[in-house]
A protein has these predicted regions:
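Conserved glycine-rich FAD pyrophosphate-binding loop
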Residues: 77-79, 86-93, 99, 143, ...
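Short amphipathic alpha-helices in soluble, non-transmembrane regions
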Residues: 9, 67, 237-242, 283-296, ...
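A conserved active-site cap/scaffold subdomain adjacent to cofactor or substrate pockets
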Residues: 245-248, 257-300
């Protein structure tokens, strides 16, 4: 039970709104964890006892101090677009909505480095960057509704990963403003080295209030659809495109059965294995040549900027899963890095699992090397069948990033990050920030 003294104390904080209606408590205690039947069962009853929405960093400090004083768990929430229960309060307590901290504080005109508050929507941030000829390097497919702080705290990569790798790669996150959960909370300005431990930590070891990020030069991305005569050709062409000397922002590979189930949005109506590409204008002719050489048919849809919300990026990454689940909630998914050569693993798994496994691949840059990751659609047949499938993938050399578990470690490489745990001990010694999500601390 939330102490009355805490409610009274928070009610007196300027620039802080308290939400207490049952509908608000339910709504803001959820994210998109229903992608996973496992998490859906585990998290369905989790509820905050109070939701607060600060408008200033000072209000954040006051909330942190009050929760620490009363020993009440505090869970942070951006837009709630995460898929792993990152912002779900496992131990109830207070959920703090960060969406009102949304100012773009500065953009360096020469370097493009941006300092932005955590609650800024990525679409709004990208719009501000475009005014000075810059753009975000990495985005989730939920970029229109996701906050930049939520992406750093709970995401890992997405659109742009084929060129820029993943968020934890050195060079993306250049600094953080962080409020600690100490007895006397502090506002810290962390440089890149110290900030790294809070990157993809689910808000368990510090409260991110602002970020400093590197950006990229704006490109007028062109949308290309390439229909291939067979699956082997599609996978091979994806490898050729990702290794070509072209500016490539997205390389999605979909087997024909997935293409049939996605919104068509005036795309070519063919039942074929398909590539979805975002490329620079000077790369269109190169992709055309590569496609023609293997008997594939390329369609140039034009500039992405002209698509007005129904572009190819909304068919990629987790939006592929979203669209299929809207048609049939019996689909769930996995995340994995495929072994090389990829086709052997892909075909072996397909032979065993048949139509219960539909292939969706994404080109990524992993530790400086072009690789193919996969977010396959998986027909839900129960937890035991899912575990058997994951073990089969591991046996073939795939690296699984399990989207059906709650902890930072479980969804990653399965090992404890000592720096993340040490940072939690330093900034949240009582373990009140998003408890239960950082396994190394819990254990």
């Amino acid at each position: 039970m939330l102490p009355d003294a805490l409610r009274t104390e928070l009610a007196a904080v300027p620039d802080l709104r308290l939400l207490t209606q049952p509908d608000d408590l339910e709504r803001f205690s959820r994210d998109a964890y229903d992608y996973s039947p496992v998490l859906q069962q585990r998290l369905a009853q989790c509820r905050a006892e109070l939701v607060v929405r600060p408008e200033t960093v000072d209000a954040v400090v006051r909330v942190a101090a009050a929760c620490r004083q009363h020993g009440v768990p505090l869970t942070l929430r951006g837009s709630g677009t995460g898929n792993y229960g990152q912002s779900v309060p496992l131990e109830s307590g207070v959920v703090m909505l960060m969406s009102q901290l949304r100012a773009v504080r500065s953009i360096d005109q020469s370097s493009g480095v941006v300092t932005v508050e955590c609650g800024c929507l990525m679409k709004d941030l990208n719009r501000e960057l475009a005014r000075v000829g810059r753009q975000l390097r990495l985005m989730p497919s939920t970029w229109r509704s996701a906050t930049i702080g939520g992406f750093i705290a709970g995401g890992s990569g997405g659109i742009g990963s084929v060129r820029w790798g993943f968020l934890r790669d050195p060079g993306h996150l250049l600094g953080l403003e962080v409020v600690t959960m100490e007895q006397q909370p502090r506002v810290l300005q962390l440089e890149a080295g110290d900030a790294e431990a809070l990157n993809h930590a689910y808000g368990t070891n510090g409260i991110i209030t602002a970020l400093r990020l590197a950006t990229a030069t704006s490109v007028d991305w062109q949308e290309l659809v390439v229909d291939c005569p067979d699956w082997r050709t599609a996978v091979d062409l994806a490898r050729r495109c990702t290794s070509a000397a072209i500016d490539l922002h997205l390389c999605t590979v979909l087997e024909a059965a997935v293409v049939e189930l996605l919104p068509n949005w005036d795309l070519p109506q063919r039942r074929s294995d398909r590539l979805l590409l975002l490329v620079a204008p000077d790369a269109v002719s190169t992709v055309q040549r590569l496609a023609s050489a293997v008997g594939a048919e390329m369609t140039h849809l034009g500039a992405e900027a002209d698509r007005h919300g129904s572009g190819l990026r909304e068919l990629s990454w987790n939006h592929t899963t979203l669209h299929l689940r809207q048609r049939d909630p019996g689909w769930t998914y996995l995340q994995m890095l495929l072994p090389q050569p990829e086709i052997n693993c892909l075909e072996t798994l397909k032979q065993t699992w048949g139509d219960d496994l539909l292939w969706h691949l994404e080109g990524v840059r992993q530790q400086g090397v072009q690789r193919l990751a996969s977010l396959p659609l998986v027909r839900w047949r129960g937890a035991e069948a899912l575990e058997q499938l994951m073990q089969h993938c591991r046996d073939l050399g795939a690296l699984i990033f399990n989207p059906h578990v709650l902890t930072v470690e479980g969804g990653g490489l399965g090992v404890v990050d000592g720096d993340q745990v040490a940072t939690k001990h330093r900034y949240d010694p009582a373990g009140l920030l998003n408890p239960g999500k950082l396994g190394g601390f819990s254990n």
